[in-house]
Amino acid sequence: MRTYRYFLLLFWVGQPYPTFSNPLSKRTSGFPAKRRALELSANSRNELSRSKRSWMWNQFFLLEEYTGSDYQYVGKLHSDQDRGDGSLKYILSGDGAGDLFIINENTGDIQATKRLDREEKPVYILRAQAINRRTGRPVEPESEFIIKIHDINDNEPIFTKDVYTATVPEMADVGTFVVQVTATDADDPTYGNSAKVVYSILQGQPYFSVESETGIIKTALLNMDRENREQYQVVIQAKDMGGQMGGLSGTTTVNITLTDVNDNPPRFPQSTYQFKTPESSPPGTPIGRIKASDADVGENAEIEYSITDGEGHDMFDVITDQETQEGIITVKKLLDFEKKRVYTLKVEASNPHIEPRFLYLGPFKDSATVRIVVDDVDEPPVFSKPAYILQIREDAQINTTIGSVAAQDPDAARNPVKYSVDRHTDMDRIFNIDSGNGSIFTSKLLDRETLLWHNITVIATEINNPKQSSRVPLYIKVLDVNDNAPEFAEFYETFVCEKAKADQLIQTLHAVDKDDPYSGHQFSFSLAPEAASGSNFTIQDNKDNTAGILTRKNGYNRHEMSTYLLPVVISDNDYPVQSSTGTVTVRVCACDHHGNMQSCHAEALIHPTGLSTGALVAILLCIVILLVTVVLFAALRRQRKKEPLIISKEDIRDNIVSYNDEGGGEEDTQAFDIGTLRNPKPWRQQSRRDMVPEALFLPRRTPTARDNTDVRDFISQRLRKMNTDPTAPPYDSLATYAYEGTGSVADSLSSLESVTTDGDQDYGYLSDWGPRFKKLADMYGGMDSDKDS
């Protein structure tokens, strides 16, 4: 039997215009009384203001996820204007109209064609209208209604994360918060219990628990130890329908990690350690490493090491390696195998970060014994002192013993030692040492005034092992002996006025002494015995290492005696007494009435070497003569250099002089024999012959020729002078030129005869020599034309 479902109008809408009513009900004949009751109820609501009712509907309800084979019936639309004759047509529009929802245009029945999901769309809004089939006009105004999708429990709870990660400190109290999980249900929370979620724990008990309503996970077991187990995996279930049977559920995984707390003290894996080190290990040398283990991690596993007890706590130290958390035993002081061979230490390891709530577990530290054995090493000799200071008088003779040094082998073998002086510190070999007993003695004489301190180095070397040696500085002080006489501090030269009075101070004397007596210097001054009697001056000793020169008479005559030389004896008071004689020069000068010097023997003051005026004049005269001689010699040499190269026009050598160029002349080729000029032979006729140069040279840059008029005048002047010179050589000489021959555009040059020997010579061939000899051809061609005329 097909069942029809009628949806009743929830409330009537009263309007001044005709209203709609919806007599929707189940299409089952079993509920006529209920429908009449609803219609009556609707009629009674509008007794006071009765108006025409057109539609009797407002909203419909439809269950989601319908699985039937037929269309799902939604409801029926009906208008009061519908008389059942088929004259009205129902039209549906809005959300899903024609697709999800269809309407029977004759009866107004609405059906859903597809399965609907409330989670996708919970409400559909549609519009209904009834029109006249014949006229096509609406008989009622268009009205809007909704279709609500009723929820069913078709969605399981879903957690916000697939996997949760959380941490909680180990040893935490029961009920300590760990993490909160959250699940959501897409069903309608306002309709039944479809969206009411309850949490429960499926895996992770008895360590953790979860609150059913909030999803908060807490610790459920006391004293969970990270060192025993660090990771926990908890599975939480979320179930809807309030956890009742038939509800849907979802699960999630929570990975919980226990974080470390300092609940474990450090522990040494062994109680005793033993190391060895040579006695030569310098301070800071690592000997060995010890390590205590701590089950904690991070800063809770940090360990500090310290030496708390033992006979070697002042000889060794322990430092902590922050990376490896190891204790490094190091040498603190120099070791000596001969003094102590074994040391015992007590080393403690402790945690710097301690949590007071775990002190009940015991002290967070541990200790171990460290035994250190010192190995013997062959050591160099050791001097009895770090440095030696000796003294010796400067008048000590050679081979005088100054003192001694001592060194011995610190090893048990006590190897013998020999001594030597480092000659780099005693280059002059002033001192020497006995290699057997270390006695220091002199090998040269000493002088305190030359060098007060001598700093040398003594070397002690083991005889059996020369590689083992030690050095010690030796400072030798040379003690003073009075072996130097006092002398004037400076050269004294003073003056006295001609009108000086007796007992007048003219100069104060000072003395110095290279010696350095223990009681200080004490000098005495006096005139030399040979000058003490009849002296014109006296010496006054001031008893403070100074003395004054006083005049002994009234007035002095510089014309009679212009200079006085006073020998002064200076003595010291040391033993043996040393003395010296110094000379003070006193000049007699003319002074004004104030005692200021006006004139003395100026030549003596200016020329202290004693040269007279005559000697100076002679020296100046010699210098003048020497300068004149040099000037004359230079002038003669210059005049010789200016002798002409072309002596006369008749010179049959006929040298060609090239200006503004170098090379190619007789001065360069040395063709001219100067010996023939000095010893001329009788002249004889010589035939002229042309020479072809043997060597070829690269062409040179042709210099700019002088003006033709200047060259012609110069040659003419030289020719006239040579023609009148009786000493001109009447012969030709062979001239070899550096630039001529096959490399030249012109042919070879022959000697040009002078006008006195070959006056009738034809120079026309010069025109055939080319453009380079055009100037020469013009010159000699002009001469021929002058002869003809």
Swiss-Prot record:
Chain ranges of the Cadherin domain: 54-159, 160-268, 269-383, 384-486, 487-608
Propeptide: 19-53
Annotated Pfam families: CADH_Y-type_LIR, Cadherin
PANTHER family, per database record: CADHERIN-23, CADHERIN-6
Side of membrane Cytoplasmic, spans: 637-789
Purpose of the protein: Cadherins are calcium-dependent cell adhesion proteins. They preferentially interact with themselves in a homophilic manner in connecting cells; cadherins may thus contribute to the sorting of heterogeneous cell types.
Name of the coding gene: Cdh6
Name by which UniProt lists this protein: Cadherin-6
UniProt comment concerning the protein's domains: Three calcium ions are usually bound at the interface of each cadherin domain and rigidify the connections, imparting a strong curvature to the full-length ectodomain.
Extracellular side: 54-615
Signal peptide: 1-18
Tissue: Highly expressed in kidney and brain.
